[in-house]
């Protein structure tokens, strides 16, 4: 491709609403153009990146035995009503009506449609296993779209769905796809981690996220440097605390803590470690009663160490806490504690409630908590002496760096990441809801076992940039760069020798299968170099009249700080030697 025929459009400054580096650089490099909140056009330079990502994904999906199809973006609401997701999903699900008043949704995912296809087509065990995938536009009506392609409303995803006869076969399919994902992200040239994850709204009991490591990532990735353990923050666990509870050494005492309503403030006021304080979090559950349709609410008190944060995903999986979990209202708190938040504790309750203690709190002695009276706390609190043992002891918290790894092989570390892929074993959640079954060898109907596998095609360029950039611009890995190499002839319009050398090198690169662009726009060297450094083309060759007189060209990898002189006859081999694809 020659630059004069291509579309190159760069900006000196990023738009004011571009918050993160990837958004700023994609706008400045002319990869995307904003149309509306969370909606972007993929410009020619950006589309080349997407097409390379899609090509790698297709190759590896096909290699893994998946078969491509395409499903509609607009889907009948009836399918979503079968699974209950039409009502359960919030305003992120875009609901529309046609001219006849019929309800439809704009797909954020395609579980319902693929399950509908499967129940019509996969009638016999002889047709299994099957794995279908698509690369398709999706829409999620984000309340606050931001960060460019990182959290847009319209986006492109690769989603795949496997169908098997039993859990063992389904888990085998899951492992095939998990390995395919590792090959995909290895080929992208990105640093990533596959981490255990919660399945969330899609459901299932086996799930992994693929996270691109980046300091600006939205997600916390937990891993153990001494082992293979890795999980996202929702799923991560620490090794259960060992030992026995210490003996009580202090008397229960009510202490004035004027205007000190947080554990940190109380610890500082009393001159004690934050770890000796206990925070009280009041939750409630709402359970619909089948008999009359009324809602039964129950209030729960969760106790965590003052330096720990609640993990709501873990809490929602506890017995009795899974139905309609929410934070209690101020009225509910007042009724049970006789006090407003900031000074709450488990002693002296106005009304009884269930108390759930985190594993660490259950082993504490002489701890500090609210006195259920404004501006007062209790010190020297001890289980058994000052209050009954908790109704339940469980893991309620997010892990912190330095916790012991649950596999016992070291301590946990935390880094930031950007989720770009997710694999789920769904089981029969959707097949049972939609009556998708096959006949086994005995002619008996059995529900299809399903898996679900997604990759954020349009999120990947943003994640790659967050991981690979510098002050000059983007640094693309070879495999997904818009162009692998760029030839920059200086004074091409004035020098027949430069033009001839540029044309020959361009032809040589094309013949060698290198995705090359020849910059024949006639720009000044400084402007030309700045454009390609901003756009992030990995390999740059500069041809000048002075260099040709010495039979040399200049080569510079995008990560290099300076150029290297290379003999003209050796330049092709030199570039190929630096390439990683």
UniProtKB/Swiss-Prot annotation:
Matching PROSITE patterns: AA_TRNA_LIGASE_II (PS50862)
Top-rank taxon: Bacteria
Transferase keyword on record: no
GO terms under cellular component: cytosol
Catalytic activity annotation: tRNA(Pro) + L-proline + ATP = L-prolyl-tRNA(Pro) + AMP + diphosphate
Gene Ontology molecular function, alphabetical: aminoacyl-tRNA deacylase activity; ATP binding; proline-tRNA ligase activity
Gene Ontology biological-process entries: prolyl-tRNA aminoacylation
EC number: 6.1.1.15
UniProt family annotation: Belongs to the class-II aminoacyl-tRNA synthetase family. ProS type 1 subfamily.
Annotated protein name in UniProt: Proline--tRNA ligase
Gene: proS
